[in-house]
């Protein structure tokens, strides 16, 4: 059976085979079917056609008649059809449910333009390209059908000795129908690939000027970032259209007889192209070659972002060989297209039948023009694109590389600094001393008083044990560092939100998971530089209900419905007058309840909405539960980062989301970046690799950026997500960024302007960590401003590995993270909240000395709508090349090598306790660099938590180790540092250390499957965790244990000063016993 025997009935109601049997001998016309030959080995080859068509065989001539399979019955056909129809309907309904609920979600947030713009663009591109490719295919096929010869035989192939026809007669009308169907199928398939690049098209039509031009062609950088990617996409689409056109043309001509190919039989074969077919194919070929040439021209501009062995961008060989050759090859490609196209259109040697040997001989003569043209183009291409650049690089550039590449290296330096925001770095020489003198910190008293001792990663378990209250709450495994005004003084603060953790529930069911336990409660904040006498964080905001310095406002809303840990959907809202069933917070009885009053999610009061969400989440409870009522809302996609990613999918989001109390509400702050990989000459960087460090490797809360190459980045957007109602606000932060300006045009009304940021919110806008990590990665090389010095690479630096990590992690080059600290650096008149890091020499040298200290001012100020003047100022303090200031790794080694430190740490680690070393901070103080590292002690019990017990300090090669930072600083600065670190009060009687916030007593508050609260087993009003209050409510046993611990600490200090290590060991043992007793009583 031939191809058209099978598919002919789809286009001819009477069937192709019946029509063939009715055919009468007459002069063929344009609508006559084409006769395709069926030959055997015994024939003499194809015979010339005559006016009377030969009788057509019903199929290929074969020796045995195959058994035909039984046709399915009508009942089976109907059943299969019904099943397929149901599957399609169900699939469409599920897709509809997903789409409609997405529209409801975006509409509720006020970002419906995002989904409609995306959908409209993607569907529009898909349909436009599908129509174009279908139109091209249809036109190409129609032209080929129109050009069919008046009389023609078909083409044949030979299979296993039999000559088989590859087509059967078909009318022009049927052929057009086939062309329409195939064209549409091809168009829809390739159109779906084209719509994925919707953002490039939108940016091209909303392009902005950068105001700077590339140094090679003098074109505005906006052309490369916005226009060029779109042009490349369009040219790729055009190339595919033209390729489809020529393929449709050739295939249709073969089927219509315009091209006839018969396999050789007894040495005879046939290859023939009609004149009209030659013209069409020649034109299509020229168009394809022109498109190829245009793509080559566009490729020239890509050389400016091409990654080389040393830099990104066009180097000497590229500029002087590759780029000119590309223009030459584009011209050659276009000329070759003309030559080949004209030859095909005018050649008369492609007709007639002849033996294969004769045909080969004729072909060599007849095809001389295209053969010579193609061969010449290949030779020229090899010489120009391969040999010439290699020879130029080998014999001219390499021997004089520094001189010949300096211009292009300088271009790379300048462009990289501009693209990464490094062009305004304030660098200064810092001649650091390593000799600590008495009173050296007198001029740095304010910075010294703000040195943060609490490690945000180590103290997370402490937060959980002291403030979690119940097992269904949790805190981030790395708490955030921010600053707050407490009693009129700016304080470095560690802060975390008490998030809901459904995994902690004992009684998991649909009612509890989705209607009862719906939210977390409040934030917990502690001083960054203060602890209690027993080493616990000193909270100034804590407890349930929350009390403290941050939430004394009556309008404070503590409930946390939206948070990184809220992964399940919740259904909230109840009719007026109905008793609340949402669990609010634990109390001494059944627990307080609450009903959500905000506008946080799509309303699902009607049956249609409930049905849609039941399908989306695969839960019939949404349809049938009484908890779903006319006032119900469904909250989902509750992670702040996820919400911002959905409303601004074109942004790259920072790896850390942090909470802040702003104007009486808890807000999650998310930093958004605009990026590009098309900034001319700027160095390409893998953002994922550049933002990895020890924190991202060990934390579930903090992550690196997604791995992708970029050579331009700006922190253009600050986003906030309200923890209560999930509302998202996007603020244009960098108003000079052309990329965010383009997105503002694409999504008008989506952004708030800088002037709309309140003063309270402004005070919590920090310089983002991921951007700083990318910048420090680049600045390790690009602090070098001279092309010649850059070429030598002798002054390149690197970020040190984290010396507090395990040996295995250090071998994997896990980098030290940057740290937020309040300090005073060169050029600043007073201490500034800053993000800091340090540098050591690049390479594998074992001598790890400090080469530079990097900081960026992270305080955005507190004025409404105005960013602080120093915010974002990057300061680099470069140490002299002959400096011997230890780097972080060497400082850690000095700590480890100290006999006194090792002895005390061994004593602390004896028994059932473990020592944990906190973050190693580097601070420019006292004319040099001070290293500060808190030391925590943690017992081995499952409910234990780290307590700050000691502080390590290093200055030069001098090491201090004491109970407080004050004492440790005094040890390395001649007995008196001249400044107070503010933590001397941390050592003393625990009865004098009162927390600033209390935890209300709470019960389990579990809920049964029917939604009613279980009667709590703990009804004595006491919580299972520390309430942060060491006042009169403390039990007598607990007070005695803490008093014993305080006395043991005093005995330890006295023994250490006398050098009586035996007494010191006894005191430490007593201290551990007292702490274990206190912890046991606390639990």
Curated annotation (Swiss-Prot):
The chain crosses the membrane at residues 78-98, 125-145, 178-198, 239-259, 281-301, 325-345, 372-392. Residues 1-72, 976-1061 are annotated as: Disordered. The keyword Membrane applies. It is a multi-pass membrane protein. It is found in: Cell membrane. GO terms for cellular component: extracellular region; plasma membrane. The keyword Glycoprotein does not apply. InterPro entries: UPF0182. Keywords: Cell membrane, Membrane, Transmembrane, Transmembrane helix. Residues 991-1013, 1050-1060 have a biased composition (Basic and acidic residues). Belongs to the UPF0182 family. This is UPF0182 protein BAD_0641.
């Amino acid at each position: 059976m031939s191809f058209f025997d099978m598919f002919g009935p789809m286009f001819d109601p009477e069937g192709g085979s019946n029509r063939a049997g009715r055919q009468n001998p007459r002069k063929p016309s344009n609508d006559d079917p084409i006769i395709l030959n069926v030959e055997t080995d015994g024939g003499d080859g194809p015979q010339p056609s005559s006016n009377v068509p030969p009788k057509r065989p019903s199929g290929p001539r074969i020796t045995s008649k195959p058994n035909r399979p039984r046709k399915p019955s009508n009942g089976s056909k109907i059943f299969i059809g019904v099943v397929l129809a149901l599957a399609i309907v169900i699939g469409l309904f599920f897709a509809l449910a997903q789409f409609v609920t997405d529209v409801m979600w975006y509409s509720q947030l006020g970002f419906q333009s995002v989904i409609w713009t995306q959908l409209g663009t993607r569907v529009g591109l898909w349909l436009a390209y599908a129509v174009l490719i279908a139109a091209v295919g249809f036109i190409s096929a129609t032209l080929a059908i129109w050009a069919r010869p008046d009389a023609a035989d078909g083409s044949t192939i030979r299979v296993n000795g039999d000559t088989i026809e590859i087509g059967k007669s078909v009318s022009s009308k049927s052929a057009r129908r086939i062309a329409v169907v195939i064209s549409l199928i091809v168009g829809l398939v390739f159109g779906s690939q084209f719509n994925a690049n919707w953002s490039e098209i939108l940016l091209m039509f909303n392009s902005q000027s950068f105001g700077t031009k590339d140094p090679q062609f003098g074109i505005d950088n906006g052309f490369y970032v916005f226009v060029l990617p779109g042009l490349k996409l369009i040219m790729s689409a055009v190339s595919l259209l033209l390729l489809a056109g020529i393929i449709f043309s050739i295939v249709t001509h073969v089927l219509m007889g315009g091209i006839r190919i018969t396999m050789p039989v007894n040495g005879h074969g046939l290859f023939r192209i009609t004149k009209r077919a030659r013209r069409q194919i020649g034109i299509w070929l020229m168009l394809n070659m022109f498109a190829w040439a245009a793509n080559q021209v566009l490729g020239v501009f890509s050389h400016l972002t091409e990654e080389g062995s040393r830099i990104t961008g066009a180097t000497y060989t590229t500029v002087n060989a590759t780029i000119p050759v590309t223009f030459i090859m584009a011209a050659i490609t276009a000329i070759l297209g003309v030559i080949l196209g004209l030859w095909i259109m005018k050649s008369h040697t492609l007709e007639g039948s002849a033996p294969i040997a004769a045909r080969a001989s004729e072909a060599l003569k007849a095809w001389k023009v295209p053969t010579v043209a193609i061969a010449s183009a290949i030779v020229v291409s090899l010489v120009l694109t391969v040999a010439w650049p290699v020879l130029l690089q080998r014999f001219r550039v390499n021997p004089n590389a520094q001189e010949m590449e300096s211009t292009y290296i300088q271009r790379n330096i300048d462009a990289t600094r501009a693209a990464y925001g490094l062009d305004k770095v304030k660098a200064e020489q810092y001649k650091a001393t390593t000799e600590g003198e008495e009173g050296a910190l007198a001029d740095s008293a304010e910075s010294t008083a703000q040195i943060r001792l609490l490690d945000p990663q180590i103290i997370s378990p402490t937060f959980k044990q002291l403030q979690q209250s119940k097992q269904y709450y949790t805190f981030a495994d790395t708490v955030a560092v921010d600053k707050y005004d407490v009693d009129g003084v700016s304080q470095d603060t560690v802060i975390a939100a008490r998030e809901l953790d459904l995994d902690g529930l004992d009684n998991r069911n649909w009612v509890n998971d989705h209607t009862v336990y719906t939210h977390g409660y409040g934030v917990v904040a502690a001083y960054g530089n203060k602890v209690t006498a027993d080493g616990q964080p000193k909270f100034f905001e804590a407890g349930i209900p929350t009390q403290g310095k941050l939430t004394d406002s009556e309008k404070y809303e503590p409930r946390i419905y939206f948070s990184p840990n809220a992964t399940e959907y919740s259904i909230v809202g109840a009719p007026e007058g109905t008793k609340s069933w949402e669990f609010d917070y634990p109390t001494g009885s059944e627990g307080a309840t609450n009903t959500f009053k905000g506008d946080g999610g799509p309303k699902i009061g009607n049956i249609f909405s409930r049905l849609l969400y039941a399908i989306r989440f695969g839960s019939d409870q949404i349809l049938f539960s009484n908890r779903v009522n006319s006032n119900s809302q469904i909250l989902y996609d509750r992670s702040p980062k996820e919400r911002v990613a959905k409303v601004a999918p074109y942004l790259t989001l920072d790896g850390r989301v942090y909470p802040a109390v702003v104007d009486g509400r808890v807000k999650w702050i998310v930093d958004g970046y605009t990026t590009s990989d098309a900034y001319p000459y700027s160095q390409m960087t893998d953002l994922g690799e550049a933002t990895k460090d020890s924190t991202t490797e060990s934390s579930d809360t903090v992550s690196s950026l997604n791995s992708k190459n970029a050579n331009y980045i700006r922190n253009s957007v600050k986003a906030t997500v309200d923890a209560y109602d999930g509302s998202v606000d996007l603020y244009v932060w960098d108003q000079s960024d052309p990329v965010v300006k383009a997105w503002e045009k694409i999504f008008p009304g989506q952004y708030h302007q800088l002037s709309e940021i309140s003063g309270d919110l402004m005070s919590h806008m920090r310089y983002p960590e991921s951007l700083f990590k990318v910048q420090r990665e680049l600045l390790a090389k690009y602090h070098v401003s001279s092309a010649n010095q850059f070429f030598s690479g002798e002054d390149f630096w690197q970020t040190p590995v984290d010396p507090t990590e395990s040996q295995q992690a250090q071998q994997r080059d896990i980098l030290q993270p940057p740290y937020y600290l309040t300090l005073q650096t060169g050029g600043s008149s007073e201490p500034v909240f800053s993000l800091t890091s340090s540098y050591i020499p690049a390479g594998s040298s074992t001598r790890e000395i400090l080469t530079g200290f990097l900081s960026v001012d992270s305080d955005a100020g507190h004025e409404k709508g105005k960013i602080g003047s120093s915010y974002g100022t990057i300061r680099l303090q470069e140490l002299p090349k002959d400096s011997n200031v230890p780097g972080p790794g060497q400082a850690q080694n000095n700590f480890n090598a100290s006999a006194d430190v090792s002895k005390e740490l061994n004593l602390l680690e004896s028994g059932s306790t473990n020592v944990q070393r906190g973050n190693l901070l580097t601070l420019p103080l006292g004319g040099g660099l001070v290293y500060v590292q808190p030391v925590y002690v943690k017992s081995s019990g499952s409910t234990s938590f780290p307590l700050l017990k000691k502080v390590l300090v290093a200055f030069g090669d001098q090491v201090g180790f004491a109970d407080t930072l004050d004492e440790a600083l005094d040890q390395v600065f001649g007995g008196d540092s001249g400044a107070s670190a503010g933590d001397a009060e941390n050592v003393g009687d625990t009865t004098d250390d009162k927390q600033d916030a209390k935890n209300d007593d709470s019960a389990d508050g579990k809920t049964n499957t029917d939604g009613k609260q279980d009667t709590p087993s703990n009804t004595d009003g006491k919580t299972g965790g520390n309430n942060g209050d060491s006042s009169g409510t403390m039990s007598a046993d607990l007070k005695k244990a803490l008093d014993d611990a305080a006395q043991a600490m005093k005995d330890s200090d006295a023994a250490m000063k006398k050098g009586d290590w035996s007494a010191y060991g006894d005191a430490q043992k007593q201290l551990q016993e007292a702490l274990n007793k206190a912890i046991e009583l606390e639990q």
